Amino acid sequence: MAAPLLAAAAGGGPLLFRQLFDANTGTFTYLLADVPSGQGVLIDAVFEQHARDLSLIRELGIELVASIDTHAHADHVTGSWLMHEATGCAIALAATAGATNVSRPLVHGDHIGFGRRQLEVRATP
């Protein structure tokens, strides 16, 4: 397996960024981690790729803070619930989706922190 991609970014210290792809659904999943703290987030997890994603998170020693769904998915089944069960991470999704079992219902302007970094929620049409 290739070494993690590290990039200097706002917030200080290296940022781990991994782009993962599920060919069956055409879905990109993103793993971001604040390297100094070891905390990270997973964005748009795919149900069928849970084992791959969990293996990578464990291999890199990341403490997963949240599994974030950018929208309610018609193109694939989310893997966020499985990731929550495996790691205890929060499940984050737009409050307007009306989904149950979401621990972080998100609205425009919310922030999701991991280590010394944060993502800002931007509602889009």
Please report, for each region that a protein language model flagged, where it lies by residue.
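Glycine-centered loop/turn motifs
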Residues: 5-6, 109
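Conserved beta-strand hairpin/beta-sheet module of binuclear metal-dependent hydrolase folds
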Residues: 6-64
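Active-site HxH/HxHxD metal-binding segment of metal-dependent hydrolases
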Residues: 26, 47-123
